[in-house]
């Protein structure tokens, strides 16, 4: 968090102010944000303009108090408050123009320069799209019911919120598509041969539309038809290795693993729901009974959609008909499923699409339709984000599919995300700032009252004027919103206290202690997280101001104490002149600052120091996060927050607030100390000036504290229950507070929620001087309403704003969705790159994915590469749009994981899981993948590891003349061939005619390569042989007799074609022998076994006569058809047709959407690919954004005007 204004040193501060003064004289603009400098010659305090910046979200990064980046901007924000639409425009001065657009209140007041309202508006009434027009929503409200909420006695008040009905739009992550997209599709190769002219039977127009795509794919002359990944899947295969570096280029298991990861992410993030259009056909024009009267407008492709056309080859049609005799196959709309009110939910459709895409469509639709969010859940969600005295009612939910914002193990995923991706806190803070800024609690005045008083007071001590001149600097609404929001934002690293000269030994040094006390009263959570630094500064001042007390204090209490077995052990200070370091961690370890001990003897040993500590300590108590728990937001056991303020239920200024009493006491005590301790420094006139300053500060404190207790108190009650604020803030016990102790622990590494160590967060710099700006430079909503602040102190009687939940429900749900997505990605990485985590029932599939990847070989940098690769798939955006871009940055603590656990860590010691202390979900490895995402992941796993897994092991090099190439032919080495497992012991030399030749040494006999016969050289590992050995082997297979080189462990990806025009025989035997064993070779195989005779095209292929590279394993599992031609009107012997598993539509489990074969076998349990399935198609009126009306009746206003 940036300070109000940061300078490297006083010289820079003076220079910068001088430059800005010159710039201001050149800019004649009206402004209301001020900064103050002291004129070098007049002794007066001049006012000059500064530019402020408001947090914004750009390129996935929040520029707010958690970053040092700033950007000037003009934005328009709209806050719906009951019937009001309160719009403010922030200009470059940070001052808002506020327009109250409520129907019965027409007031406009400006606090600064007015800019054009050009930016996106938040909180405006959403546009109602066709799925829920205004007439529908007007009817929806008729079913509203009152939620369970304690109703306060109604009294006659001026309400700005009564009987309000708002529309809540729940933006879902599901999307629709009317054109089915397969994950697997047919690919056909046409043979280029001389063949008899094919005969086509005529078909009518309707049949031509229905059958033509399938006739083109399975036409006469087709050599082979095989299954390939569709373009949307295949494009994910990396061109180069991006994750796991290898020593060679080309395709490797690293590429393959990265491809698997990308496909799993693609499936896991998929939320597409099919909404097909249909048309009716004349049944009399179609002879196939499997084709139903209502069919999709997008025609599918399948052998089943050509078999009744009587188109050549007829034998193929007849063979398919025989094949499917006992199978369940239908094309088109099978039935329509209605709900209890006879409203269409979805159509059950038979369609040629692979079972994986069909299952994914079905799963998405059923998840969407099955989101059973109960009425009380919606009520709890709205209440969690609402003013506590709003009586909530909502409309009927019967036709609404509201996205769930809760699931099992949410807390684990939130904790994991914060530990491993700490930048997420920026988004948490951005949400809090959005909320607080919309409340418009503070406005900035045109001049600072403290400066004004000092400017006009002739009795003021010059050192005090200079001190305030130094401390009071820029303040704007952005800074104010930042600081107040930080009280509820989880702080995960010790903030850095802004450095400056504390003027030790001078009276003004006690003003700095007063500043720290006032800051602690207003911001105890931030204070708690930098308590060590604050103590160091207080003791540094007291070392000179109250030296005797200081010496007694450190002699008895030291700087720190530990708690051992429930007892305090104070650490003695050896050197009484030693200054306490600000860098010691008193937040996460077992050190506590002694100044804030609860030891009762402190007041007798060092009464002044005890008084300072007492003034700083919070007096309020913890409030349970009951509404957050009811809304099913992630929370720890006994979750609570400290609201630093106390409720103020009386309008007007006749009763001082509790916070005012504390601040009054602090000002009174510290000024008495100033006058007492530095009596010799003040003559009579300066002493009177100090008294007048004290009186002014006391006067300014009252309206500020009215706002804190009367308005901000209620804002904090809402913010404490927001989803993102799941980590408790301070408990108010400065003597014993420990930050959240949970951490992700893995293989001896600890990644904490709250980071420890002596390093401070340089990006979260706190300047406690904000208290002087709040006192002297602001008006506030509560004060304006009752006439304590504002223009001429005239009461406006406009209720302070409590933002309505409209603007925060969607960001809240999307934040949860984004964390689920990022944790799911991490879950995928753990599943593949770690062998210690499995999915029950999917061990075999995961083992296939892990081939070639062993955990010790996956470095931390490679893990980071994997995250970055996936990040690029997710895209970027803020919490309203897309998964969080920056969450996958790994510069901080993200590292390679093996089997992470969430555990408490005390004093760097990992604590065991304790059932009555720790959440149950922390007992085992966190479930990073949400259950619905797990189903999508399992679908991808099955697709990747079944017949579509095209990596084959085992090749044989053997040169043989071939009339035809048949990919179904697997080379088998004859039994009479001797197999030698090749080693360097089988290589020798022989000298002839004074020339040394390399030869083979087989059975003790030296043999030239050309003389080798009936030998199989088994090469278990490639890429390790010297050049002369490779040369010998190649000469043996080229010139020897019946010689083989078998490579049982070599990996390759076969590509098959029957089209001679596509065949590129680029793989050389030498390359196979010299390539590293991790390489996966891409080898094209030519299939021309069905040529009726050698054609001129075939003879033109230079290597068609000889074949050297042979597969020793089956490579044809993807081939679905072969040889669609006639041999004298009959089926050629080498021709192939589909298997039943490909064409068996079967049925589905309508509970889960999982495809099932006619036999009852689940298709996910088979390695075979089914290209005809039952898919669910939703009606266009079913898939729509949920829109409900809610009404909030305010039973008690913020201010109860008399």
Swiss-Prot record:
Biased composition (Basic and acidic residues): 10-21
Main localization (coarse): virion
Domain of life, source organism: Viruses
Keyword RNA-binding attached: no
Keyword Cell membrane: no
Region of interest called Disordered, as start-end residue ranges on this chain: 1-45, 73-99
Chain intervals with Polar residues compositional bias: 27-45
Localization terms from the record: Virion
Keywords: Capsid protein, Inner capsid protein, T=2 icosahedral capsid protein, Virion
Gene Ontology CC terms: T=2 icosahedral viral capsid; viral inner capsid
Family under the similarity heading: Belongs to the turreted BTV-fold inner capsid family.
Subunit structure: Homodecamer; each decamer is made up of two conformers of VP2, called VP2A and VP2B. 12 homodecamers assemble to form an icosahedral capsid.
Additional information: Function inferred by structural homology with BTV-fold inner capsid family.
Task performed by this protein: Inner capsid protein that self-assembles to form an icosahedral capsid with a T=2 symmetry, which consists of 120 copies of VP2, with channels at each of its five-fold vertices. This capsid constitutes the innermost concentric layer of the viral mature particle.
Protein name, UniProt field: Inner capsid protein VP3
Organism the protein comes from: Aedes pseudoscutellaris reovirus (isolate France)
Top-level taxonomy: Viruses, Riboviria, Orthornavirae, Duplornaviricota, Resentoviricetes
Gene label: S3
């Amino acid at each position: 968090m940036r300070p109000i204004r940061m300078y490297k040193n006083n010289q820079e501060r003076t220079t910068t102010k001088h430059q800005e003064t010159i710039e201001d004289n050149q800019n004649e603009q009206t402004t209301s944000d001020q900064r103050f400098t002291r004129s070098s010659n007049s002794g007066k305090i001049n006012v000059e303009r500064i530019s402020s910046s408001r947090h914004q979200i750009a390129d996935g990064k929040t520029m707010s108090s958690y970053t040092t980046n700033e950007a000037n901007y003009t934005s328009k924000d709209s806050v719906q408050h009951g019937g009001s639409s309160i719009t403010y425009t922030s200009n470059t001065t940070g001052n808002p123009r506020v327009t109250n657009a409520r129907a019965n209140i027409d007031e406009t007041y400006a606090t600064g320069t007015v800019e054009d309202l050009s930016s996106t508006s938040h909180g405006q009434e959403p546009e109602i799209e066709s799925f829920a027009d205004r007439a529908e929503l007007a009817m929806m409200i008729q079913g509203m019911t009152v939620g369970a909420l304690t109703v306060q006695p109604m009294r006659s008040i001026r309400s700005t919120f009564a009987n309000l009905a708002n529309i809540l739009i729940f933006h879902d992550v599901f999307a629709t598509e009317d054109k089915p997209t397969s994950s697997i599709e047919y690919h056909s190769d046409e043979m280029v041969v001389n063949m008899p002219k094919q005969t086509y039977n005529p078909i009518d127009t309707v049949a031509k539309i229905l059958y033509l795509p399938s006739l083109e794919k399975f036409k006469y002359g087709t050599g082979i038809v095989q299954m390939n990944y569709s373009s949307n899947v295949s494009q994910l295969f990396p061109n180069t290795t991006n994750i796991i570096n290898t020593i060679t280029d080309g395709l490797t298991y690293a590429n393959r693993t990265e491809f698997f990861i990308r496909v799993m992410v693609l499936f896991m993030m998929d939320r597409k729901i099919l909404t097909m259009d249909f048309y009716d056909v004349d049944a009399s024009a179609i002879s196939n009974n499997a084709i139903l009267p209502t069919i999709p407008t997008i025609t599918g492709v399948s052998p089943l959609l050509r078999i009744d056309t009587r188109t050549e080859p007829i034998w193929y049609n007849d063979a398919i008909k025989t094949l499917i005799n006992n199978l369940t196959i239908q094309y088109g709309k099978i039935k329509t499923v209605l709900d209890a009110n006879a409203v269409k939910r979805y159509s059950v459709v038979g369609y040629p699409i692979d079972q994986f895409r069909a299952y994914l469509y079905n799963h998405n639709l059923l998840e969407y339709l099955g989101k059973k969010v109960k009425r009380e859940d919606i009520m709890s969600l709205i209440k969690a984000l609402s003013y506590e005295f709003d009586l909530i009612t909502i409309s009927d939910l019967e036709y609404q599919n509201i996205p769930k914002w809760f699931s099992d193990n949410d807390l684990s995923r939130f904790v994991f995300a914060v530990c491993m991706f700490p930048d997420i806190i920026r988004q948490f803070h951005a949400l809090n700032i959005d909320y607080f800024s919309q409340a418009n609690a503070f406005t900035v005045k045109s001049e600072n009252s403290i400066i004004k008083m000092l400017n006009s007071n002739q009795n003021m001590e010059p050192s005090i004027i200079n001190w305030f001149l130094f401390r009071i600097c820029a303040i704007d609404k952005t800074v104010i919103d930042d600081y107040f929001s930080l009280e509820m934002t989880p702080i995960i690293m010790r903030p850095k206290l802004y450095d400056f000269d504390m003027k030790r030994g001078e009276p003004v040094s006690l003003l700095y202690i007063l500043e720290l006390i006032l800051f602690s009263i207003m911001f105890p959570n931030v204070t708690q997280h930098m308590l060590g630094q604050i103590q160091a500064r207080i003791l540094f001042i007291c070392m000179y101001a109250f030296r005797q007390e200081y010496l007694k204090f450190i002699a008895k209490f030291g700087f720190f104490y530990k708690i051992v077995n429930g007892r305090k052990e104070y650490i003695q200070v050896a050197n009484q002149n030693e200054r306490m370091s600000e860098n010691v961690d008193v937040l996460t370890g077992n050190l506590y600052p002694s100044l804030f001990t609860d030891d009762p003897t402190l007041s007798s040993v060092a009464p002044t120091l005890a008084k300072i500590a007492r003034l700083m300590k919070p007096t309020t108590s913890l409030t349970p996060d009951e509404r957050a728990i009811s809304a099913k937001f992630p929370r720890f056991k006994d979750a609570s927050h400290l609201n630093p303020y106390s409720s103020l239920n009386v309008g007007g200024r006749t009763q001082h607030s509790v916070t005012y009493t504390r601040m009054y006491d602090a000002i009174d005590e510290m000024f008495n100390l100033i006058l007492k301790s530095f009596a010799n420094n003040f003559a009579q006139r300066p002493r009177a000036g100090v008294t007048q300053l004290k009186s002014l500060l006391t006067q300014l404190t009252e309206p500020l504290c009215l706002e804190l207790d009367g308005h901000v108190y209620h804002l904090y009650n809402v913010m404490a229950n927001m989803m993102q604020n799941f980590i408790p803030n301070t408990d108010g016990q400065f003597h014993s507070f420990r930050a959240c102790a949970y951490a992700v622990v893995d293989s001896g590494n600890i990644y904490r929620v709250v980071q420890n160590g002596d390093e401070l967060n340089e990006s979260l710099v706190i300047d406690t001087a904000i208290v002087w700006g709040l006192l002297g430079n602001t008006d506030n909503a509560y004060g304006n309403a009752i006439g304590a602040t504002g223009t001429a102190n005239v009461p406006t009687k406009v209720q302070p704003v409590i933002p309505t939940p409209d603007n925060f429900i969607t960001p809240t749900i999307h934040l949860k969705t984004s964390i689920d997505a990022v944790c799911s990605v991490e879950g995928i990485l753990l599943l593949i790159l770690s062998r210690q985590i499995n999915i029950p029932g999917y061990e075999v599939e995961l083992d296939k994915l892990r081939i070639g990847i062993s955990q010790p070989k996956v470095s931390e940098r490679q893990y980071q590469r994997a995250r970055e690769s996936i990040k690029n798939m997710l895209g970027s955006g803020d919490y309203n749009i897309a998964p969080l871009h920056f969450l996958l940055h790994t510069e901080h603590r993200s590292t390679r994981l093996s089997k992470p656990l969430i555990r408490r860590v005390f004093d760097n010691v990992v604590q065991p899981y304790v059932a009555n202390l720790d959440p149950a979900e922390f007992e085992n490895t966190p479930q990073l993948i949400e259950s619905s995402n797990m189903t999508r992941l399992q679908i991808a796993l099955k697709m990747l590891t079944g017949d579509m897994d095209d990596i084959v092991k085992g090749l044989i090099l053997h040169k043989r003349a071939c009339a035809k190439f048949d990919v179904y032919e697997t080379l088998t080495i004859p039994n009479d061939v001797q197999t030698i497992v090749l080693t360097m012991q089988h290589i020798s030399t022989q000298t002839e005619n004074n020339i040394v030749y390399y030869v083979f040494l087989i059975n003790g006999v030296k043999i030239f390569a050309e003389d080798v016969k009936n030998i199989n050289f088994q090469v278990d590992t490639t890429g390790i042989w010297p050049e002369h050995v490779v040369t010998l082997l190649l000469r043996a297979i080229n010139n020897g007799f019946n010689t083989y080189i078998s490579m049982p462990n070599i990996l390759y990806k076969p590509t098959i074609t029957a089209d001679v025009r596509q065949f590129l025989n680029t793989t050389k035997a030498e390359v196979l022998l010299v390539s590293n064993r991790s390489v996966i070779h891409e080898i094209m195989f030519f299939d021309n076994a069905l040529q009726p005779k050698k054609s001129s095209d075939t003879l033109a292929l230079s290597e068609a006569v000889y074949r050297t590279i042979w597969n020793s394993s089956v490579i044809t599992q993807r081939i679905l058809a072969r040889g669609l031609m006639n041999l004298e009107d009959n089926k050629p012997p080498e021709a192939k047709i589909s298997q039943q598993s490909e064409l068996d539509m079967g049925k589905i489990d309508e509970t889960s959407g999982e495809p099932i074969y006619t036999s009852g076998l689940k298709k996910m349990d088979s390695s075979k690919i089914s290209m005809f399935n039952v898919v669910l198609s939703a009606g266009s009126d079913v898939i729509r954004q949920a829109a409900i009306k809610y009404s909030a009746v305010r039973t008690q206003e913020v201010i109860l005007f008399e």
